[in-house]
């Protein structure tokens, strides 16, 4: 096994790097084990020759934490960790948990509520023009308009709230390499609209290839039948994507206000 990934600037410079290709921001402590999705993504990128630094549980009140590696050449990768941050923080009765089993010593309060949104916004504040790619369970389950138990309302796609450029859902070790190689070859992230297992936002419906239309965000907020219809279409297309090669070109479109997801 190679060395652990750099977790601070000193370790990055010790490798002779002046700039990483990616900075992975994670709500968990850095655990380099295949039971942790972040480790799989980072090591897969590393095996393809990319330089990856790991920013574990940064202080989300301090933007300088997000600048310690400098601006990554290809982008920030952001996840809440192995578990949804709201499930990690609250019981089903919405009572606050005080321990975090994904933090050394089970110490609580080392990550924010809605970690993907908060980390993404802080990364954007640190470097306004950096590419921001979100993924993991928290992003995957919120990739389109969805009912949020904690707020007891329908929320927009997390890619909107996080102000991210791209969302990778499900198992991302293959799609992240496609993204990385495209960016490395000079393709702008706004043109990555053709990859399976990704979500992007646009104002132009022409960017979606053979779209399957979903009810708009406004419709699913105001009409329970429209919400059920949206979920049903998503479910059928997700099943198709896992069972039929013919479904590879299907694109679900959620009209969220002025944005198309």
For the regions a protein language model found, what residue spans apply to each?
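Conserved small/polar residues in nucleotide/adenosyl-binding loops
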Residues: 242-247
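Short beta-strand/loop segments at the ligand-binding rim of alpha/beta enzyme cores
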Residues: 127-136
